Amino acid sequence: MISWNYASASLLCYFWFKPDLSHVSISNTPWWLIIALGVLLPSVFLFLAKSLQYAGIVKTEIAQRLSVILSLLAAYFIFQEQFNQLKIVGVVLGLAAVMCILFTNASGGGEGQKQAVWYLALVWFGYALIDVLLKYTTGLGVQFSVALSLMFICAFLLSVGYVAVTTKNIGLTKNVVAGLCLGVLNFANIALYVKAHLLLKDSPAVVFAGMNIMVVLLGVFSGLLFFKEKLKLATAIGLVLGITSVACLAYAMSV
């Protein structure tokens, strides 16, 4: 299912953004980045699925959205972005939120809880790494639509190849259909996010904060209402710290 998700995402990316693939070349295209992201994209999807299985939707959504903390640290240490006091407070609160979420699972000591901690950490780190590599790609002069198309195509080919080698088939019909539908949602998420940045190009903090805060809240409420998950004290504290962290960072970027 994950493999075929990137097939439909590739097609939609081509027809939506209409990338000019004539400029793609062996020497001028950052293939190492394309391949790295082609491996990371489906891998993080697998980590996400395992995290949902062992840790639940509430903690997984929070960990995923708080990956922005690592991205901001990379912005400071790698991309030399200047940090004010509010940004530093936001980073510290975000790290504290992640620790609360991870130690909610670590406290029990069971095998499933240990796996939950590992997969939450992989989701947190994986999404941040993808974000950093995407930012690095856009700074190399490659059209974002071209890079995105190549990433989706690479992710599809590598994941299909992996499935074909390990399972000797490329999926049941229902999994292929489900994957194609998932690709529509996956692409829509990226396309609408880019569109929002284009429409609000002078207010990126509004788009950034709106996406992260609302997704975390919707993820938490979905877990509580539909999946009947219990909200432990440490998770609740992590949620509050996470929302406060993103709010601080958004305000810091807008002043």
Q: Where are the regions a protein language model picked out?
A:
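Polytopic alpha-helical membrane proteins, predominantly small-molecule transporters/carriers
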Residues: M1-V255
